[in-house]
């Protein structure tokens, strides 16, 4: 997946009918003979002219401030991952998930919950992702099996489905063989 960063376009290009400056401001900016100061830029010009101290103590303080900001950011991210881990069902319950596992399971769980919303919890096998993949009749009609969510897969491996699955085995992309009942 490629992402492209686009530079913002000037407002005058996007909205040619709208002027950026009022007529008074345009007249002021066009007059080169004006020696007046409007007060908006005096402080900024004065600040630019003041040389900055770049001594070793200033550099150390800047580095310490940057380190403190990074620690706060890292702590915030870790707190968010901890909160997300508490919302994702895992087996065993006390299993510690890495960050990438947490993100992958969260994505899978969201897909599972979306299937539950679309198909309802009343699926006869308790696994809405199988119904979404193979249709309500359960026949494949020559279709390739697609990936299923981790939660239906886990339920399937535990034998959580209510049907007798017999010996019908299908290979799901990137996953060990699954037993899926055909009607």
Curated annotation (Swiss-Prot):
Q: Name one GO cellular component term.
A: nucleus
The family database entries (SUPFAM superfamilies) matched by this protein are listed as:
HLH, helix-loop-helix DNA-binding domain (SSF47459)
Note the PROSITE patterns from the entry: BHLH
Which UniProt keywords are listed?
Answer: Activator, Developmental protein, Differentiation, DNA-binding, Nucleus, Transcription, Transcription regulation
Q: Which region ranges are annotated with the description Disordered?
A: 24-46
Q: Where does the record place it? A: Nucleus
One GO BP: stem cell population maintenance
- bHLH domain: residues covered: 61-113
The induction field says: Surface ectoderm and neural tube are the sources of inductive signals required for gene expression and for somite formation.
| UniProt GO MF annotations | DNA-binding transcription factor activity, RNA polymerase II-specific; E-box binding; protein dimerization activity; RNA polymerase II transcription regulatory region sequence-specific DNA binding
* Signal sequence segment: none
Q: InterPro entries, per this entry?
A: bHLH_dom (IPR011598), E-box_TF_Regulators (IPR050283), HLH_DNA-bd_sf (IPR036638)
Give a short account of what the protein does: Early transcription factor that plays a key role in somitogenesis, paraxial mesoderm development and regulation of stem cell pluripotency. Essential for the mesenchymal to epithelial transition associated with somite formation. Required for somite morphogenesis, thereby regulating patterning of the axial skeleton and skeletal muscles. Also plays a key role in regulation of stem cell pluripotency. Promotes pluripotency exit of embryonic stem cells (ESCs) by priming ESCs for differentiation.
Q: How does it assemble?
A: Heterodimer; efficient DNA binding requires dimerization with another bHLH protein.
**Name of the protein described by the UniProt record:** Transcription factor 15
Which species does the entry assign this protein to? Gallus gallus (Chicken)
Taxonomic lineage is: Eukaryota, Metazoa, Chordata, Craniata, Vertebrata
Q: Which gene encodes it?
A: TCF15
């Amino acid at each position: 997946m490629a992402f492209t960063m686009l530079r913002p376009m000037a407002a005058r290009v996007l909205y040619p009918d709208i002027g950026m400056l009022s007529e008074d401001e345009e007249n002021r900016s066009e007059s080169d003979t004006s020696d007046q100061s409007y007060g908006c830029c005096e402080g900024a010009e004065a600040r630019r002219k003041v040389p900055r101290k770049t001594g070793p103590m200033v550099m150390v303080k800047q580095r310490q401030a940057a380190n403190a900001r990074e620690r706060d950011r890292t702590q915030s991210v870790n707190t968010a991952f901890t909160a997300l881990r508490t919302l994702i069902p895992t087996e065993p319950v006390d299993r510690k998930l890495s960050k990438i596992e947490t993100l992958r399971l969260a994505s899978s769980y969201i897909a599972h919950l979306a299937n539950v919303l679309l198909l309802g919890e009343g699926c006869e096998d308790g696994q809405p992702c199988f119904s979404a993949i193979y249709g309500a009749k359960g026949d494949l009609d020559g279709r390739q099996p697609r990936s299923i969510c981790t939660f239906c897969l886990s339920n399937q491996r535990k034998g959580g489905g209510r049907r007798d699955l017999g010996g019908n085995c299908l290979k799901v992309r990137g996953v060990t063989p699954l037993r899926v009942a055909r009607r």
